[in-house]
């Protein structure tokens, strides 16, 4: 049989062309150091910053330091079984978390894995934890009100949808209570809430989850928790995971309230990681980019344009101060990033004024444009009245010889302080807030004893519910005050039939 060299050559060429190599090419490296939530590895010369890397035990890490000899990695999970010499490989992906409706009502860790014992979360959607914030032209002005249900906030430091409002104060001054009450008040408001617990005790997180469940708020809330017992990388990544979940809803035209409790602990975790990765320390041993740590997080909260769905993320970040020092490094950083701050004072808290909001140091830079018209009309001078009362109260300590006008201001001020008090987990709808503040600013409480103010308030609401519910409905639907004469008649009728003369 004659062998045709040309045919053989053509056959070999065809085989080569059709050859499909089944190689899985992965760049791998070797762990050279492991400890305290970080690892170093050699051989990953092409790793990208923020890339997910997989260790031989299945744990993932994130590339943070790209150096000439090795890569500094933060480990997102258990690192107790990782050893020097273990293999670590590139994945070519960046960190993503599951997102979507399936997460609502669940308690998850910063990787999106459920920790509430209610089974797996069935969702197909994922979002990267690090994404650019919306640009200037992708945003809208804040104009829709977000009601917290707390008179002291809704009247003095109003918050709008898409705003970033810092809650700052010492430990045990009621910061978490303010945020939980704000979440409870979103029931029926078409809002999705995300509570991010950073470095909290697991028992504390359990208590907050039970509170949300008891009041029916878990039906529209996601809880993301990185407890104090977890490695620093998870505390560092938790807020970014929370806002990634929020962005999924925002870009689908929904409104989200996200609470970061608290960013001081995230900054401490980031400082710990940075020092372990041998980054140069700066002021208070924080790394040079600690401002960027918080700015890139909080800038992702926005009211986006109609082209992007018109949704919003409203952020309530917490910062814990030491001895009321709001001029500390992290505190001033976050104050400069946010659109205002609510300062909770220990002295006020201990004297029974709760929420312990210091009206003089608290401000909302953009919330005024979102405040409803009715609240603007009744609370317009409230802040000034309160400030002048505090000033006069300081003067009265030096002498008691006061003229009638000064005495009247002091009397009104004492009643204002009482009215702004509120029991825990009892947020008020805005129409009730407007009515009681109207009664206060128009002098209807001037003859009511200070000790009876809170009882007067409760009785007034019950009376209006029974006889003047249409006034509540008017405020609720029109966002404006009803006829003042009608309000005056209603309040006078209540006083006439009550024991509060």
Curated annotation (Swiss-Prot):
Q: Which GO terms describe its molecular function?
A: ADP binding; ATP binding; proton-transporting ATP synthase activity, rotational mechanism
Q: How does it sit in the membrane?
A: Peripheral membrane protein
Write out the transmembrane intervals.
none
Q: Does the keyword Secreted apply?
A: no
Keyword set, alphabetical order:
ATP synthesis, ATP-binding, Cell membrane, CF(1), Hydrogen ion transport, Ion transport, Membrane, Nucleotide-binding, Translocase, Transport
Q: Pfam families from the entry?
A: ATP-synt_ab, ATP-synt_ab_C, ATP-synt_ab_N
- Site (Required for activity) at 362
Q: What's a single GO CC term here? A: plasma membrane
What is this enzyme's class at the first EC digit? translocase
**InterPro entries per UniProt:** ATP_synth_asu-like_sf (IPR023366), ATP_synth_asu_C (IPR000793), ATP_synth_asu_C_sf (IPR038376), ATP_synth_F1_a_nt-bd_dom (IPR033732), ATP_synth_F1_asu (IPR005294), ATPase_F1/V1/A1_a/bsu_N (IPR004100), ATPase_F1/V1/A1_a/bsu_N_sf (IPR036121), ATPase_F1/V1/A1_a/bsu_nucl-bd (IPR000194)
Where is this protein primarily located?
membrane
Enzyme Commission number: 7.1.2.2
Gene3D superfamilies attached to this UniProt entry = 2.40.30.20, ATP synthase alpha/beta chain, C-terminal domain, P-loop containing nucleotide triphosphate hydrolases
List where in the cell it is found: Cell membrane
Against NCBIfam families, the record matches this protein to: atpA, PRK13343.1
User: What is the documented function of this protein?
Assistant: Produces ATP from ADP in the presence of a proton gradient across the membrane. The alpha chain is a regulatory subunit.
Tell me its family.
Belongs to the ATPase alpha/beta chains family.
Name-wise, this protein is ATP synthase subunit alpha
Gene name tied to this protein: atpA
